[in-house]
Amino acid sequence: MINPIAALSPLDGRYAKSVEALRPIFSEYGLMRARVKVELNWLKALATEPKIAEVPAFSDFTLAEIDKVIENFSLEDAAAVKAIEATTNHDVKAIEYWLKERFSGVPEVAAASEFIHFACTSEDINNLSHALMLQEAREAVLLPKLAEIIEKLTGMAHELAAVPMMSRTHGQPATPSTLGKEIANVVYRLQRQFKNLQAQEFLGKINGAVGNYNAHMVAYPDVDWETHCRNFVEISLGLTFNPYTIQIEPHDYMAEFFQAISRVNTILIDFNRDVWGYISLGYFKQKVKAGEVGSSTMPHKVNPIDFENSEGNLGMANAVLGFLSEKLPISRWQRDLTDSTVLRNMGVGVGYTVLGFAAHLRGLNKLEPNPAALAADLDATWELLAEPIQTVMRRYGVANPYEKLKDLTRGKDGITPEVLKLFIESLEIPAEAKAKLLELTPALYVGKAEELAKRI
C-alpha cells in the first residue's frame, strides 16, 4: 500500500480515511471483483440454457464453489490477476485466464472452461461491471450519506422554524423569513434529487462485439439470445437491459447519474455559501473545539472551514462528473477506447462528492443560532414593513400606496417604529386593519414561514 503522505491524489492521501467506503467499489480491485461476478454469473446463466448441451446444469456443490469465489474475491486474488495481466497486457483476458486456473480443480467448471467469457467482447463484461459498481456506490454510500444530511437539515428546519430572520435579496434587506424555513427550502430541493438518484436505472448489455449477437447466433442459432441476455442482465445482475447498443453500452445512463449527483452537489454548494454568509453576519455561531487553530497569526479566528472545504470538494466533484457526463456518451462509430481510461475516474467524481458531503455535515453539527444578532438586524430595519403596509392600503383602495411607501422609506436612514406609526395612523383604512398594522414588527412579519418549516 502507498503511504498516504506519498499519495499523488489527496483522495488516497490526506482524505483516504474519509473515502474508505468507496475503495472496495471503485479501485482496480473493485473493478476486478465486479468482472469476476459478471463472468461467473454468465457461466451460470449458460448452464441454465438446455439448448447449450456443452454446459450442463451445475450441481449444488459447483454452484456453491462459484459463489464462494464471487463473494470472497480478495486482494491476493487481484494480485494474481495482475500477474497474469503482466503477460497478456489485457485486463479482461487476465480475469478469464485466472478463472480458468482457479476452477481447474472443480470438474464441472473445468469441463466447461471455454464457456468462461463465451461470445463476449471485453465491453460486455466491463459495462456490466461498471453498472454494478455505480449501483453499489449509490446504495452503500451515496444515498445513506445524503439521507444523513437531509435528516440533519430537517431536524434543524423544525428546531429553528420559529426563529425570525431578515432575508436578503441582492444582498439588501428584504421581507423576513425564519431560519427554519430557509433550511426547509434546501431540504425540499435535496429530497427531490434524492428521489431522482433512487430512481436512476443502471443499464447493461451482453450482445457481443457490435451489439447484434453475431457470435452467439453462429454458435447456437436455436437459442433465444435476446431473451437469455435480458434475463441475465435483469434477473441475475439486477440491472436494466439495453437492447440497442454498439460494442459499448452508450453510457447515457451514466451521464444521467453523474448529472443527478452534480445537482445534489450544486444545491449543497449553494447552501454552503449561504451558511458561510450567515456565519459572517453573526446569525450562526460555531462551536469551538479545544486545541483547534483558526489562523496561523490571528488567535481569535473561528473560520467556517467545513463549509469552505465542502464547497471546494463539491466543486471538484462537479468538474469531474461534468466531464464524465459530456464525454462518456460519445464514441466513434461502433466504439473507440477513449471511454476506457475515463471510466477509471468514476470514483474520483464520487469520492470528492463524498468528501463534500462529510465536510458539510461536520459544519452543520457545529452550528448554533445566534438569536441576539438575528433580532438586532430585524429591529434595525423597520422599513421591511413597507411591503405589508402598502399591500393593506391596496386592499382598501388607498391611492398610490406603493409610491407613498417608496417616498417614505426608499434610501432613507432612520426608519423607526415611530415614523411608521405616524404614517399608519394617518391612513384612511378600517380601524381593525390599522390596529393590526400597528401591532406588526419585523420579527412578526414572517407569513407562513414557521408552518412551512415544520411541515417539511
Positions of PLM-derived features:
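Short amphipathic alpha-helical segments with heptad-repeat character
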Residues: Q135-L143, A147-I150, T154, A184-V187, ...
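A helix-coil-helix interface module used to build multimeric assemblies
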Residues: M1-H216, Y220-N231, G294, F307-N309, ...
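Active-site-adjacent "gating/activation" loops or surface patches in catalytic cores
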Residues: V223-Q247, H251
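Glycine-rich cofactor-pocket loops
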Residues: H158-G180, K285-K301, R332-T341, N365-A380
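Generic, well-ordered alpha-helical scaffold segments in large soluble proteins
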Residues: N41-L46, W98, R102, A137, ...
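Long, amphipathic alpha-helical stalk/connector segments used for oligomerization, subunit docking
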Residues: N309, N313-N400, K404
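Glycine-rich anion/phosphate-binding loop at the beta-strand->alpha-helix junction
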Residues: Q193, I246-R332
